[in-house]
Curated annotation (Swiss-Prot):
EC nos: 2.7.11.1
A biological-process GO annotation: positive regulation of type 2 mitophagy
GO molecular function term, any single one: ubiquitin protein ligase binding
Post-translational modification: Proteolytically cleaved. In healthy cells, the precursor is continuously imported into the inner mitochondrial membrane (IMM), where it is proteolytically cleaved by mitochondrial-processing peptidase (MPP) and then undergoes further proteolytic cleavage by PARL or AFG3L2 to give rise to the 52 kDa short form. The 52 kDa short form is then released into the cytosol where it rapidly undergoes proteasome-dependent degradation.
Name under which the protein is recorded: Serine/threonine-protein kinase PINK1, mitochondrial
Cofactor(s) this protein requires: Mg(2+)
Length: 580
């Protein structure tokens, strides 16, 4: 009994000593009471500004709040307290002092065990991340077996126009496998004609031997760059940000393209971002519909009043069935499907942020759609002509003059961008601008009108809207998705969740219900759930020749897995569910 009382008294005294001599930490968010979502995400803290060239802080498991003062060496802290205690005692520690340090040693053992558990969890997350990172980097390239082909416009058969935008026209195209196929296509008169007008068989199906069009060729409109390849590449370099290394291996007239230190960044591949397979300059051809659709953009030898130059840039990409706007005009996805579509956009934006690139022109017209074998849509972000991909400024653009370009889409321009004022030390931070645009596009995905489009009283402007003016989403939308969309559209960027945190929230709401149902989120339970998800995802990926949308999303989640970020998302979800 005496020993028990001594140990109990020692624990009380040890705790009092720790509270007295340990450094007082600032407000931190971890396993304690959930803080605001501001700056939550990949290694961020509320109010923290990350410099453009800074490496991301290694993220480990945060200790519970009651252990935060053990950030310095445990051994060093123990020695410091012991020295101060011995100085005060001036004669050595008696039985009471020995009990204090015995209790203190027991406490250190518990904390070291907690730290070891956190290290094991962080290590498990890193191993899972390494496995799936390699898998998600694989982006199919239909031209990978033709490394030295496809760098001339003459290598392609051009079909019908797919669409046109503010600065380019897009046509379907194919590359004949063998030279005799090219001759056959020319003989049948298929050059310049799409599948709607090709020869049909007796049963109404497409005739054998008729080419299909797996590629889309984007022909840029060259009004101000001149006709030299150097000037064209310099003026339109942002279009080359999502280009692969092989895509830029061709000759550009008399010029070989070389990425310069002052040029834009090269974007690493991602399943939710367009990939440019080939890029080259060539003479402007008179393509189908050109005189009717964009005569003013043609060279004068095609149209006397045309403003275009005789040479321009061509980009070869995958041909997708439709844009997101076209898809939503025909179909209204279910709430679960709409959640997964929003999640895909967040995954793409998070990848851009990690690479230090801002798209700045996100809208449903610039998002392409294809379907998996189950009919679920897969979204791809395209059109990087307005992107910010500067190697020197990162996501913080110096705004020292009103002539500095803010971006391309004024309607979906984040408040911190649209309200920025130029000045000698002014800077526009784009780190959460694309995330805000995803929140606005989410209204369209869930079947509602985009509140930042249109006219009348329902129309909002990013410069002046208040969060209370945002339209309420219907009850059919999952509550987590409703809360997240409103959170993405907060005016203050510091209160807005990062794309990574938002993506983790949707991942957990879709597939982590078992984890969220736990009263206390324990590390061993979380790691067991992650291992189970990893095994199931690997098995699903191996069993199917082409992964479905859900499997792809789970692979992306595991490829970006970080223990602390996952805990933050779980805490945010728990706080939303606990709120009235």
């Amino acid at each position: 009994m005496a020993v028990r009382q001594a140990l109990g008294r020692g624990l009380q005294l040890g705790r009092a000593l720790l509270l007295r001599f340990a450094p007082k930490p600032g407000p931190l968010f971890g396993w304690g009471k959930p803080g605001p979502a501001a700056a939550w995400g990949r290694g961020e803290r509320p109010g923290q500004v990350v410099s453009p060239g800074a490496q991301p802080r290694p993220v480990g498991l945060p200790l519970p709040d009651r252990y935060r003062f053990f950030r310095q060496s445990v051994a060093g802290l123990a020695a410091r307290i012991q020295r101060q205690f011995m100085v005060r005692a001036r004669g050595g520690a008696g039985p009471c002092g020995r009990a204090v340090f015995l209790a203190f040693g027991l406490g250190l053992g518990l904390i070291e065990e907690k730290q070891a558990e956190g290290r094991r969890a962080a290590s498990a997350c890193q191993e899972i991340q390494a496995i799936f990172t390699q898998k998600t980097k694989r982006v199919s390239d239909p031209l990978d077996t033709r490394c030295w082909q496809g760098f001339r416009l003459e290598d392609y058969l051009i079909g019908q126009a797919i669409g046109k935008g503010c600065n380019a026209a897009v046509y379907e195209a194919t590359m004949p496998t063998l030279p005799q196929h090219l001759e056959k296509a020319k003989h049948l008169g298929l050059i310049g004609k799409g599948p709607d007008v090709v020869l049909k068989g007796a049963d109404g199906e497409q005739a054998p031997g008729t080419p299909t069009f797996p590629f889309a060729i984007k022909m840029m409109w060259n009004i101000s760059a001149g006709s030299s390849s150097e000037a064209i590449l310099s003026k339109m370099s942002q279009e080359l940000v999502p280009a692969s290394r092989v895509a830029l291996a061709g000759e550009y007239g008399a010029v070989t393209y070389r990425r310069s230190r002052d040029g834009p960044k090269q974007l690493a591949p991602h399943p939710n971002i367009i990939r440019v397979f080939r890029a080259f300059t060539s003479s402007v051809p008179l393509l189908p519909g050109a005189l009717a659709d964009y005569p003013d953009m043609l060279p004068p030898h095609y149209y006397p009043e045309g403003l275009g130059h005789g040479r321009t840039l061509f980009l070869v990409m995958k041909n997708y069935p439709c844009t997101l706007r076209q898809y939503l005009e025909e179909q209204t996805p279910s709430s679960r499907l709409a959640t997964m579509m929003t999640l895909q956009l967040l995954e793409g934006v998070d990848h851009l942020v990690q690479q230090g690139i801002a798209h700045r022109d996100l809208k449903s017209d610039n998002i392409l759609v294809e379907w998996d074998s189950d009919g679920c849509p897969w979204l791809v972000i395209s059109d990087f002509g307005c992107c910010l991909a500067d190697q020197h400024v990162g996501l913080r653009l110096p705004f020292n003059s009103s002539s500095v370009e803010r971006g391309g889409n004024g309607s979906l321009m984040a408040p911190e961008v649209s309200t920025a004022h130029s000045g000698p030390s002014a800077v526009i931070d784009y780190s959460k601008a694309d995330t805000w645009a995803v929140g606005a596009i989410a209204y369209e995905i869930f079947g509602l009108a985009n509140p930042f489009y249109g006219q009348g009283s329902a129309h909002l402007e990013s410069r002046s809207y208040q969060e209370a003016q945002l339209p309420e989403m219907p009850e059919s939308v999952p509550p987590e998705a409703r809360r997240l969309v409103r959170s993405l559209l907060q005016r203050e960027a510091s209160k807005r969740p990062s794309a990574r945190l938002a993506a983790n929230v949707l991942h957990l709401s879709l597939w982590g219900e078992h984890l969220l149902a736990l009263k206390n989120l324990k590390l061993d339970k979380m790691i067991a759930w992650l291992l189970q998800q990893s095994a199931a995802t690997l098995l699903a990926d191996r069993l199917r020749e082409k992964s479905c949308v859900e499997t792809k999303l789970q692979m992306l989640f595991l490829a970006n897995l970080e223990c602390e970020a996952l805990c933050q998302a779980a805490l945010l979800l728990s706080s939303w569910r606990a709120a009235p």
